[in-house]
């Protein structure tokens, strides 16, 4: 499995925090793909590589779907699986062992939480290809439309919820969190959710507090 990080041009603080946690926990030998949305000036995908990390800068910002759209348009190995993360995540020391031990037999996607998975989890290239029309309908190349894509008819977990072979990792349905705090010292308050089944922390700015924010 490859690790895919969904990020944005304005989210470098969060991205570097996640990448540092990967390095601290010996994930240097994994293939990591970082998809960075919001580079509207680009005519096409811009791809660079640094050691085990491939950086893909893209000219759209499709919120959680930016990375999935990029995998749809650039990758075609139908035997591949991806661990899909937001840049506002941090991994624990058991993260790699947990993903390595997951049984992918007859599975095309895996949620990390039975209720809300925030599009975080495991996707096969096959299921990404199967939801081609849905993903392309979420492709946003207009910076001024981002909030609309976040808050109106957002379809969070749409692929997970419509994949007949989807599973929930360890059947987890808990909500373990701390905060809110200004986690990144950027002025944005966040809660920190912990998913023990994945050994993953999600640093979350939108948690049902009554308004949506795209601030970093």
Predicted regions, residues:
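ER/Golgi luminal nucleotide-sugar-dependent glycosyltransferases, focusing on the catalytic module
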Residues: 1-216
């Amino acid at each position: 499995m490859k690790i895919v990080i969904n990020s944005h041009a304005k989210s470098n603080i969060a991205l570097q925090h996640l990448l540092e946690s990967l390095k601290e926990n010996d994930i240097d030998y994994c293939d990591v793909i970082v998809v960075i949305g919001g580079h509207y000036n680009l005519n096409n995908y811009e791809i660079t590589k640094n050691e085990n990390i491939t950086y893909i800068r893209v000219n759209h910002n499709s919120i959680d779907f930016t990375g999935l759209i990029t995998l749809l348009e650039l990758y075609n190995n139908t035997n591949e699986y991806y661990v899909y993360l937001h840049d506002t995540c941090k991994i624990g020391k058991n993260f790699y062992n947990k993903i390595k031990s997951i049984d992918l037999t007859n599975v095309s996607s895996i949620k990390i939480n039975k209720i809300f998975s925030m599009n975080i989890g495991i996707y096969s290239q096959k299921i990404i290809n199967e939801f081609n029309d849905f993903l392309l309908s979420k492709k946003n190349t207009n910076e001024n439309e981002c909030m609309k894509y976040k808050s109106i008819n957002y379809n969070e977990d749409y692929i997970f919820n419509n994949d007949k072979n989807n599973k929930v990792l360890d059947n987890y349905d808990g909500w373990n969190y701390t905060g809110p705090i200004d986690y990144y010292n950027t002025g944005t308050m966040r809660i920190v959710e912990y998913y023990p089944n994945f050994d993953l922390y999600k640093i979350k700015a939108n948690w049902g507090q009554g308004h949506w924010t795209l601030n970093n």
